[in-house]
């Protein structure tokens, strides 16, 4: 099994996502887990064992291989079974869909429902809530044991 985890784009958010990523690793110990991330985040996960390797997404970067359509083509070649989309962006869902990921799990925000196979209902934006709770919900949806 191949799993793609689309990582949050900010260092602090990625750190908060590591517990949910650990739950995915524990639930799927034999899976190859690929982290999709901005290049500057690779060192944050280095040595953690949470991912087996990374692919970079840098839409404004100088390397054309890290842009959306090139990344989608690369994902298609990977034949990924499961994608967890931590970022709530339309772009992330579009890349996962165009990349041919079989099962795409994320929150139904910003018209991205059509690109997800498992579109979870988000909590209201009117009420503040910890983003880590959303990361746990994604992990729980794919069968992971979560805190709480």
Positions of predicted regions on the chain:
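Catalytic machinery of carbohydrate-active enzymes
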Residues: 1-148
């Amino acid at each position: 099994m191949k799993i793609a985890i689309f990582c949050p784009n900010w260092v602090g958010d990625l750190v908060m996502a590591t517990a949910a990523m650990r739950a995915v690793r524990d639930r799927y110990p034999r899976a190859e887990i690929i982290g999709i991330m901005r290049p500057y985040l690779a060192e944050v996960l280095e040595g953690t064992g949470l991912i087996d390797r990374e692919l970079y997404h840098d839409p404004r970067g100088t390397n054309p291989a890290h842009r959306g359509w090139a990344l989608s083509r690369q994902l298609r070649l990977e034949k990924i079974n499961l994608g967890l989309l931590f970022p709530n962006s339309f772009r992330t869902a579009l890349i996962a869909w165009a990349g041919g990921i079989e099962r795409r799990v994320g929150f139904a925000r910003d018209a991205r429902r059509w690109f997800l196979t498992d579109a979870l209902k988000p909590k209201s934006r009117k009420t503040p809530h910890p983003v880590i709770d959303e990361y746990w919900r994604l992990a729980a949806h794919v069968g992971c044991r979560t805190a709480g």
